[in-house]
Amino acid sequence: MDRIPVSKKDTGMRSICVFFQHMWQQLNLNSLEIPLKEVYSFMGYNDSEPDEQTRRTVEYLLRECAQFLRPQFKYVIVDGTLDLEQNQLTLIGEKGPVTFDAGKIICRQLRGAQRYAVFVATVGNGYFQWTDAVKRRDDMFQTYAMDCVGSQIVESVADYMETVLQKEIDPSGFKRTNRFSPGYCGWHVSAQPALFSLFTEKNPCGIELTESCLMLPMKSVSGIIGVGPDVRYLPYTCGICNKKDCYKRR
């Protein structure tokens, strides 16, 4: 964990500055809460119970994946300014300012933030070996279930990351917003390269970006979280977003 150097202009933020700038952790799967209900939801079981075969398959895959996956996350805290008229967010990284057309929904949700956590989370590069092992069995259902298990694991990694972030900012009386990612809530996925540029390394947590801004391993997430004494953490409000295929939509 690297600390933020405090300059004179930062003295009003000293209580948060002394805690961190970068945070990276690799996790053991046993430290993660992976709700089976959420895995089944990814599989389409929103209002119904999965059958016995589905339950056995998911439980087997959760045991098996521990051999392959090395979940990890990283976040960096940066200064930034929010322009609610232009619906833009400018973040100040080590290489200079980066401006995002984050859209009305996200900018409104970030109101009150004094700083911003830029994050990535992933199941790790072992996901490639795990998918190869499962696909060699030539079992389409197991391959589908594996994809859903991976989706929930990376969500659990991001959830865990949020608890770590909150513990770091608690002594300052800071709260956090929801996490927001390029590709959702009106923020175009093409913002990914600019977001990644805010990290010191090209491939944080070993995540690579393709030319189409797809993250590899695919079971990876990135985004921002606002922090400050006046921000709010709200349930995901699907009614104000027009993305019909969002994974958070219920």
Where are these regions (language model features)?
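Intrinsically disordered, low-complexity segments enriched in serine/proline and basic residues
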Residues: M1-F19
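Active-site helix-to-loop segments that bind/position phosphate- or nucleotide-bearing substrates
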Residues: F19-T143, R232
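Extended alpha-helical regions
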Residues: L36-S41, C241, R249-R250
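Conserved active-site and cofactor/substrate-binding residues in soluble primary-metabolism enzymes
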Residues: R56, Y60, Q152, S156, ...
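Structural signal for hydrophobic packing residues in well-ordered secondary-structure cores
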Residues: L62-L69, F73, L165, I169, ...
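Internal, well-folded beta-alpha domain core
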Residues: D138-L198
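Short terminal or interdomain "cap/linker" segment that borders an active site or interface and mediates
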Residues: S172-K248
